[in-house]
């Protein structure tokens, strides 16, 4: 009876642990989804506003500038916009690198839990399997 009770306790503990880990994974997935929605919404609004502002700027400059300075000004605007695009792409790359570690901690903890359960059941350790 004692062995049966031990197996029952290990099973219940394992199920509770799995439930907690799945809740943690769900919370991390919700946070990731919210981050992506916010990021994509902000990028869309920024793109539209940038497009409208540049079109207005170009129409205004076209009517104000004399023909000789138009080329210099328009090329400078194009070079400045290209430089800003490069900076924003580098910033986006940096932000996305931070997201690479998404759920790594949770998965590591799940692996530790599995090893602890195997140890409690008396099965061979992971060192023997690797």
UniProtKB/Swiss-Prot annotation:
This is Uncharacterized protein PM0613. GO terms for cellular component: plasma membrane. The keyword Transcription regulation does not apply. InterPro entries: Phage_holin_3_6 (IPR009937). It is found in: Cell membrane. It is a multi-pass membrane protein. The chain crosses the membrane at residues 35-57, 72-91. It comes from Pasteurella multocida (strain Pm70). Pfam families: Phage_holin_3_6. Keywords: Cell membrane, Membrane, Transmembrane, Transmembrane helix. Its main location: membrane.
């Amino acid at each position: 009876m004692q062995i049966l009770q031990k197996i029952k306790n290990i099973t219940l503990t394992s199920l509770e642990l799995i439930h907690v880990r799945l809740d943690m994974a769900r919370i991390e997935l919700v946070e990731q989804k919210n981050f992506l929605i916010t990021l994509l919404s902000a990028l869309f609004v920024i793109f539209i506003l940038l497009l409208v502002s540049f079109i207005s700027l170009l129409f205004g400059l076209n009517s104000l500038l004399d023909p000789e300075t138009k080329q210099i000004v328009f090329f400078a605007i194009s070079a400045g916009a290209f430089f800003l695009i490069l900076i924003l792409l580098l910033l986006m790359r940096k932000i996305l690198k931070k997201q690479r570690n998404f759920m790594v901690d949770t998965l590591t903890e799940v692996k530790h839990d599995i090893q602890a359960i195997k140890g409690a059941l008396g099965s061979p350790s992971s060192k023997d399997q690797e």
